[in-house]
């Protein structure tokens, strides 16, 4: 019994002694962070070089208090938009940082490949970068469209503004290959060949960079022959929990409406075209006079089937924070967009084109040990697209092709009217042909660990990353036909018949797995000479 008590006391002393030694090995310093105008800087990160376990952030008054290991003599202060500053400190004396604005961004870290970061001032490759704060200024449902005009060397062509289909075709420094000209998309250091960049929430993006020269091929191989688009999402920082809520409402309008001739002018030109072909005029002088003075009905089909404006709403909630052990950022977003095409809901379905998009992003960084840390990135996007059975291209063609002299678009009792030689009237294409419900899901998950081998030689580390990407696309179609009636001299006669809905479904799923492992060496000698290499 006596031996057991002695053993237990030894164990207790061992653990308490370890904590006492740890406490004795730590010191506490305090200070303040200001800019050139002597204004306090909130959220500045202060840490001990090469020892991320000892890190803190400044408060709204620019003040900070932090623990430091025994023997440390230097601390470094960083904040976006300012040059990094390293200072030597003395115990029991406040540390006063005065940060200088970094207009040229020389101390900005660029993520050039596989989570490897380089200081902008030291990177020699051809690269262009835009910060996420600039991208959120453009209220666009498609993320790729927000890059237009913001990155030198990036050519973007947008051929449609249809909700959920307004992505741009992008080229970096023109057309480069006969096998394909699409640049490689890299999301947080992981190549993402299946990733639909158009669905990305701009509120989650820290920066976007493009690699434009041979350096891209050296880093990513033949897949980067047309350049690389590097997307870096936001991460949590040390400090108190921050909650940001963003809401915006925007209006989408056509930049220019088509100029359409009047019904009377159309009738005259139609007759002239028939005469030029040796035919018989279609409209009498009496009808032309009626179309001209308005006694006979005429239509501007663009004005009939197109709304003046369409709305888009975006909602976003962002929660971030962290400490020396765990840093986190969680973002949830919702987007709703309507279409300019005017559709009518019926008893069986709603053919109106609408986009519902849900985005969830969660980035977590964990320091497991002084020499070991890990991260987990999760990005999920869900698109729900509801629209009529026919695409917007067919509808717009029908609007432009349908003669303004055709009555309608429906009779008083709801019958669809068309011309004798127009089998698919615009009203029927929009409201009576059926529907499609499309669901798209993008999932990107990455997990990685970094082992600092500084205890062997300063600046040496090894890292391993596994990335998983999955893409699902499924569509439910409900197709039908409908009765339509063409006007002739004696009244209306029916063509086609109304059919019940016929349902069908298509679905496909793809996935991509990426493994990365490399050794990194980064060290500064003499305060001036830097060596950075990885395999």
Named regions from a protein language model:
Residues 2-8, 18-361, 374:
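Short, small/polar-rich motifs associated with maturation and membrane association
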Residues 243-247, 330, 376, 447, ...:
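Membrane-embedded beta-strand positions of outer-membrane beta-barrel proteins
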Residues 13:
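Predominantly soluble domains enriched in secretory-pathway, periplasmic, or organellar proteins
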Residues 335-357, 387-389, 440-442, 454-535:
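Small-side-chain secondary-structure face that scaffolds active or pore-lining regions
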Residues 254-256, 295-333, 337-340, 351-425, ...:
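Flexible loop and strand-edge segments within Gram-negative outer membrane beta-barrel domains
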Residues 264-297, 394-425, 476-501:
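Surface-exposed loop/turn segments flanking beta-strands in extracellular/periplasmic regions
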């Amino acid at each position: 019994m006596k031996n057991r008590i002695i053993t237990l006391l030894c164990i207790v002393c061992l653990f308490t002694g370890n904590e006492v030694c740890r406490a004795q090995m730590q010191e506490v310093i305090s200070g303040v962070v200001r800019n050139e105008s002597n204004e306090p800087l909130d959220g500045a990160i202060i840490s001990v070089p090469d020892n991320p376990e000892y890190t803190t952030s400044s408060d709204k008054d620019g003040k900070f208090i932090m623990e430091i290991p025994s023997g440390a003599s230097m601390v470094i202060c960083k904040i976006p938009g300012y040059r990094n500053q390293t200072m030597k400190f003395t115990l029991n004396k406040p540390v006063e940082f005065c940060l200088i604005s970094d207009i040229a961004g020389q101390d900005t870290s660029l993520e050039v490949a596989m989570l490897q970061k380089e200081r902008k001032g030291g990177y020699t490759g051809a690269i262009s970068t835009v910060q996420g704060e600039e991208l959120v200024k453009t209220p666009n449902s498609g993320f790729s469209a927000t890059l237009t005009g913001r990155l030198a060397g990036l050519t973007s062509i947008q051929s449609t503004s249809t909700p959920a289909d307004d992505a741009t075709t992008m080229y970096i420094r023109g057309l480069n290959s006969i096998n394909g000209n699409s640049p490689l998309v890299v999301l947080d250091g992981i190549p993402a060949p299946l990733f639909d960049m158009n669905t990305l929430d701009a509120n989650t993006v820290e920066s976007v960079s493009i690699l434009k020269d041979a350096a891209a091929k050296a880093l990513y191989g033949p897949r980067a022959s047309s350049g690389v688009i590097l997307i870096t999402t936001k991460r949590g920082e040390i400090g108190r929990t921050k909650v940001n809520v963003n809401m915006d409402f925007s209006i989408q309008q056509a930049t220019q409406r088509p100029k359409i001739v009047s019904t009377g002018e159309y009738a005259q030109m139609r007759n002239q075209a028939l005469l030029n072909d040796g035919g018989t005029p279609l409209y009498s002088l009496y009808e032309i006079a009626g179309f001209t003075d308005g006694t006979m009905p005429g239509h501007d089909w663009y004005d009939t089937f197109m709304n003046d404006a369409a709305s888009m709403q975006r909602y976003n909630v962002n929660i971030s924070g962290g400490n020396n052990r765990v840093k986190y950022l969680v973002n949830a977003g919702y987007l709703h967009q309507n279409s300019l095409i005017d559709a009518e809901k019926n008893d069986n379905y709603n053919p109106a084109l609408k986009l519902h998009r849900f985005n969830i992003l969660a980035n977590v960084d964990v320091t497991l040990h002084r020499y070991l840390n890990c991260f987990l990135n999760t990005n999920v996007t869900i698109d729900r697209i509801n629209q009529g059975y026919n695409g917007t291209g067919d509808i717009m063609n029908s609007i432009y092709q349908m003669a303004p002299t055709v009555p309608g678009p429906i009779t008083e009792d709801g019958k669809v009217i068309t011309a004798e030689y127009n089998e698919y009237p615009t009203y029927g294409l929009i409201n009576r042909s059926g529907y499609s419900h499309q669901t798209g899901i993008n999932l990107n998950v990455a997990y990685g660990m970094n082992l600092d081998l500084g205890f062997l030689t300063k600046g040496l580390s090894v890292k391993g990353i596994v990335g998983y990407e999955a893409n699902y696309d499924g569509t439910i179609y409900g197709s039908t036909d409908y009765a339509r009636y063409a006007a002739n001299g004696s009244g209306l006669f029916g063509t086609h018949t109304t059919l019940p809905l016929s349902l069908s479904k298509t679905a496909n799923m793809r996935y991509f797995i990426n493994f990365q492992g490399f050794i990194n060496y980064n060290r500064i000698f003499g305060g001036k000479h830097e060596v950075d290499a990885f395999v």
